[in-house]
Curated annotation (Swiss-Prot):
InterPro entries: Csm4. CRISPR (clustered regularly interspaced short palindromic repeat) is an adaptive immune system that provides protection against mobile genetic elements (viruses, transposable elements and conjugative plasmids). CRISPR clusters contain spacers, sequences complementary to antecedent mobile elements, and target invading nucleic acids. CRISPR clusters are transcribed and processed into CRISPR RNA (crRNA). The subunit probably binds to the 5' handle of the crRNA, helping in discrimination between self- and non-self. One of its GO terms (biological process) is defense response to virus. The gene is csm4. Probably part of the Csm effector complex, that includes Cas10, Csm2, Csm3, Csm4, Csm5 and mature crRNA. Interacts with Cas10 (csm1). The keyword Nuclease does not apply. This is CRISPR system Cms protein Csm4. GO terms for molecular function: RNA binding. Keywords: Antiviral defense, RNA-binding. Encoded in a type III-A CRISPR locus. The keyword RNA-binding applies.
Length: 289
């Protein structure tokens, strides 16, 4: 049974968004650069090219951890819902298709295409918050809105780490403690993205298979089996990064580690875009293998 380190972010306030793996890796790299210098970032990149992995962040509530619904369940819904009458099967299938997350127990069932249930609710909400900006010349005010994520009590986000313990202790753990005070995802001066961090062991009972569900958004090197596309851009030290096409968490791949992109943005150092898969074995319905 695969064993991972769960990096649990206990929020001190709202987050701008739930960070994906490329955002987490970029933040970790920036933290390591601030702590140890740019040469340590190159060592971190080498460790991940050599096999270390992080997942995207997902919500938790207390001791309940949520994971992305594998896309492999959607073509298998007819078999999963066997035994239900037509109306109930239609209603349940509609809810299953809309579901984004499953708790750990039902995620493990979904990996094996066994009947599973979806959570009644998730432990956060997206909220539009009004802000006021003043014109520097006229002092006229205007209102704008920005979206933030607010968590329920005893809830937050976590991500998984897989790889050598020395890489975690030397890079990931100190970087996350640093980021807890400086913030992740922007607007830390407003109190967003600040957190306390805890580390826990987490096991996931996944089947042995040459097919995998990725728990990170990834830049595939082969054609995925089942996928949902995700376009992401962003900024790095004031320079705009090009929009890149990822496959989203929950996509299904076959023996594909993904890739890491190096960008030249006219800075004193290269910028790395994390696109490695975080694979867990998954069973596929007949006809897709």
């Amino acid at each position: 049974m695969p064993k991972f380190i769960a990096v649990k972010l206990i929020p001190k306030g709202p987050f701008r968004d739930i960070p994906r793996a490329d955002t987490l890796f970029g933040a970790i790299g920036n933290a390591i650069s601030a702590i140890h210098g740019q040469s340590a970032v190159e060592e971190l990149v080498d460790a991940f090219v050599g096999g270390a992995r992080i997942s995207s962040a997902f919500p938790y509530s207390g001791d309940t951890y949520y994971l992305p619904k594998p896309l492999s369940v959607e073509p298998a819904l007819e078999g999963i819902l066997t035994g239900l009458d037509e109306e109930e099967r239609y209603t349940t299938a509609k809810r299953l298709r809309k579901a984004k997350y499953l708790d750990l127990k039902n995620f493990e069932l979904a990996l094996r295409l066994r009947p599973f249930t979806i959570p009644e609710e998730i432990p956060y909400a997206r909220v539009d918050v009004p802000r006021v900006v003043l014109d520097r010349v006229t002092q006229d005010s205007s209102i704008y809105f920005w979206e933030e994520i607010r968590f329920r009590e005893k809830s937050g986000v976590y991500f998984l780490y897989s790889g050598p313990r020395e890489v975690f202790d030397g890079y990931i753990a100190p970087a996350m403690r640093f980021l807890g005070d400086t913030g992740i995802g922007g607007k830390s001066t407003w109190g967003a993205g600040l957190f306390e961090v805890e580390f826990h062991e987490m096991k996931i009972d996944a089947p042995g298979s040459e097919y995998s569900v990725t728990l990170s958004n990834a830049l595939p090197t082969k054609t995925p089996v089942l996928w949902r596309l995700l376009r992401k851009g962003g900024w790095s030290f004031g320079r705009r990064k090009p929009r890149m096409t990822f496959i989203a968490e929950g996509s299904i791949v076959k023996n594909d580690p993904g890739g890491m992109e190096r960008l030249e943005l006219g800075l004193s150092h290269e910028v790395y875009v994390y696109g490695l898969t975080f694979p867990l074995g998954v069973e596929l319905p007949e006809g897709l293998e």
